[in-house]
A protein has these predicted regions:
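Oxyanion-binding/catalytic loops of NTP- or PPi-dependent enzymes
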Residues: 1-44, 49-54, 60-74, 81-289
């Protein structure tokens, strides 16, 4: 907004009510040239304006233009503050993780974003390596071959790692920069909207505030279904019809959810298969995923 920078859940809520000034998936623009095919695709999908400035993609908000590094630095700066509040002291140094498929330009742009946020970036490392460290897969220093599947908000990255003597080598990577958690959310949103249209003859996509509530509830439902076999989606006073308020109450089972996202799961599995093949490995060679 004109008064403050909203990051995280506050920004997600603004995605529906203020889409023109809400920036998402800026990671896809990091280190890119304006004429890159990926930038052209982003221009079609983004709710905000992506403009050409000296051959580089910039994000336009009102009458100002920001580089992807500047936008990313705002997010990094927010996380720096969160970390400082947690440990109770200033944080100066950082190691930043990036997808294994990031090229040199994207890695340099990421380092720049960290520096703009006031950090001394010690290293930029691959996310799969970081995942292996976090999962304690390298502690025993035994040789093993690991597949890391990293499903983010808007991308899925699959990497095959060779772990040996406490070191990690990326043998192969594969991924899709247009497949991630948001696609799973969108599948639930579409189901809710379609079901409500059938039962109450009201299109919730026509009401920005109602649609924003559905989007928020879809993500919560997805998270709950990770540990439960079913979840309730209850949104009282979601809309009005003939002067009377309408309530939305639906039950979504895990089985139904899995059927809604089967094509997404199939795409992820296919990415993993290709990564294993690129690494020159067979399924029997994989020690863990």
């Amino acid at each position: 907004t004109k008064d403050e920078v909203k990051i995280g859940n506050a920004a997600k809520r603004a995605m529906v009510t203020n889409p023109k000034n809400t920036i998402s998936f800026v990671k896809r623009l990091m280190g890119a040239d304006f004429n890159d095919e990926n930038v052209k695709k982003m221009q079609k999908l983004a709710t905000y304006d992506i403009v050409n400035k000296s051959g580089k993609p910039y994000v336009k908000i009102d009458d100002k233009e920001y580089s992807p590094e500047q936008i990313s630095s705002m997010i990094v700066g927010k996380m720096k503050k969160v970390a400082e509040d947690y440990v109770g002291e200033e944080i100066k140094d950082a190691v930043i993780t990036v997808p294994a498929w990031f090229g040199d330009a994207a890695r340099t742009a990421t380092k720049t974003a960290g520096e703009l946020a006031g950090l001394n970036v010690l290293r930029v490392i691959n996310e799969p390596t970081s995942a292996a460290l976090a999962a304690n897969l390298m502690e025993d220093k035994k040789d093993k071959t690991v597949v890391v599947v990293d499903s983010g908000t808007g991308t899925v990255d699959v990497s095959v790692l060779e772990l040996s003597d406490g070191m990690a080598e990326v043998l192969a990577s594969n991924g899709d920069v247009y497949l991630g958690g948001k696609d799973y959310d969108d599948a639930i949103v579409k189901w809710v909207v379609d079901e409500f249209k059938k039962s109450d003859d009201v299109d919730l996509t026509k009401d920005n505030m109602a649609y924003a509530r559905v989007v928020e509830s879809a993500e919560k439902a997805k998270i709950e279904l990770s540990s439960s076999t079913q979840t309730e989606i209850n949104l009282p006073y979601i809309s009005m019809k003939d002067g009377a308020p309408l309530n939305l109450a639906m039950t979504l089972s895990r089985a139904k959810f899995e059927s809604l996202v089967k094509n997404l799961n199939d795409r992820t599995v296919e990415k993993a298969k290709v990564a294993v093949e690129k690494a020159g490995k067979k399924y029997a060679d994989i020690d863990c995923i």
